[in-house]
């Protein structure tokens, strides 16, 4: 069982989407169920509407799930598991205040040591715990042995017990910490493989230790994806616009192109342009590079142009939403436009009222002639017919003709454009 477990705390990051895509692909390859779990236990950071937005984005990318969970609805199970660990003396109540812990951290810092919880409350007698009225957290006792696990991308990883510490699993408000909720949910939902960003590597031994302490012995496999760098080679920040999937979509980049690019990023693929369904046939998670991958917006836009060309004409007409059969004309314009947004602007420029500027007189002459001109099969015949009837020459012919046909003084060669614009010429002459 594979899962994608986002938090509804902001726009979906492309790194999260990449993890969702890879989990979905692997689930399909293994013929396993795919879980979507909304990790909403950090109530202070949750943003209204983001849960639905996550589902909408996944649907746009063709990612479906067989099971849907809300993490906060599992709170009773988290508390039951915490009580089990306390009753078995594997976890303990810790009454240390934030101020006390901070003072110990500062002391360790001055001594040049890494701070580790010193076990102050670990050996408290049961009666002392019962009689103490201070707020408390619950800590899981640190492991006693080296923890090892295999990562499909990073290989063999090991963590020494002193580097894991006796960490908090339940807060003073009786809500679980991220690692505890995540580990318990994965256990209850029978997750068998976790694919996520490498920023979670340090969480893995803690989650393994939680499940082991609860007596869960089913093997879990992992793949931690390398971080995505921005175009300057620095870890991509959530503050950067194109790190947001929502921003990319609103910019007119197709879901299929984004998926194509993210699958290809830091990965060897048999071809450059492909669909998600095609990738399912050959994708290999172990072939993903260990090294961070640099995000290249220009490359993504290039891929987007190719995906626009792949769209069926009737579907592209719906996307453009201009009530005309403009698919072939729009695909021709991918030599200039890289996104659906840019294509819509090109189409509007063609079919909206135009500013003739200094060529107003010439444009009026040409428009009158174009209303009834014969639509020749080739551009040369069309051009020669119009030249002879208009008595215009050079710049005073070609510039106004370009404005009438495209809405711009610059653009593609009119001879190249003609086969795609021909059927609309009579209409354009009447705008």
Curated annotation (Swiss-Prot):
Short motif 'HIGH' region, span: 6-16
InterPro entries xrefs: aa-tRNA-synth_I_cd-bd, aa-tRNA-synth_I_codon-bd_sub2, aa-tRNA-synth_I_CS, aa_tRNA-synth_I_cd-bd_sf, Glu-tRNA-ligase_bac/mito, Glu/Gln-tRNA-synth, Glu/Gln-tRNA-synth_Ib_cat-dom, GluQ/Sye
Positions contributing to ATP binding: 238
Keyword Zinc appears in the UniProt entry: no
Protein name per Swiss-Prot or TrEMBL: Glutamate--tRNA ligase 1
Cysteines engaged in disulfide bonds, as pairs: none
Domain of life: Bacteria
Gene name as annotated: gltX1
E.C. numbers: 6.1.1.17
